[in-house]
């Protein structure tokens, strides 16, 4: 499972429980288009490691 964290200027949003890395990556790319979104991070829940990052 993967969790996506979307960082805005003054707060963060989370999208937990994404089943596959491919789905998480696609969702992260969509979230990166949100107005005001800064960094979007995909984290592997099992290992705790960051698997994918988009910084703007």
Task: Name every feature range the model reports, one short phrase each.
Residues 1-14, 41-44:
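Short aromatic-glycine-(Arg/Gly/Cys) micro-motifs in beta-strand/loop hairpins
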Residues 11-17, 48-53:
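Surface-exposed loop/edge segments in extracytoplasmic proteins
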Residues 6-8, 20, 52, 56:
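Intrinsic disorder/low-complexity segments, especially N-terminal tails and targeting/processing regions
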Residues 3, 11, 27, 53-54:
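Aromatic-residue detector
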Residues 18-40:
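A short, charged, amphipathic alpha-helix used as a generic interaction element across diverse proteins
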Residues 33-56:
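Short, mixed-charge low-complexity intrinsically disordered segments
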């Amino acid at each position: 499972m993967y969790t996506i964290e979307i960082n805005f200027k003054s707060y963060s949003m989370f999208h937990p429980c994404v089943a596959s890395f491919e789905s998480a990556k696609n969702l992260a790319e969509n979230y990166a288009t949100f107005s005001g979104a800064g960094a979007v991070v995909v984290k592997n829940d099992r290992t705790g490691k960051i698997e994918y990052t988009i910084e703007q």
